[in-house]
């Protein structure tokens, strides 16, 4: 059993949080995973109930965003409005809806695509060459994206945790 906590610095990443315990360990592990997959600047996007985006340039965590995931966004819209309904479908292509259910799904999809495009714009303003590390249980929300040379898919939290475990094993064998 391995238990990890967010750290101020590890694996060449310096955390920007003044109080690192306020950062969820899932975000930290996602960055640890991403740093192993990229030797360039990167942003890591973990897509699930919430979508987290964190930016790292030259080993320095610049900060990030936390936004509602697709399901949360859709459910909040349905719960907060009358006569707006949704289905359980997640669009696999980018487009527009032709009935209320599709409009809710494609609208939430477009909002999340806006987060992705904003992340690309932000990191582009900091570094011209960068990688995009994408993972999470709902990463299929971004299935329509063309796979670019600078995009990597990962099981972020598990691979970040595995990186810590390998490091601990190496420490144990060197003593």
Give the residues covered by each predicted segment.
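Short beta-strand scaffold segments in enzyme catalytic cores
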Residues: 44, 51-56
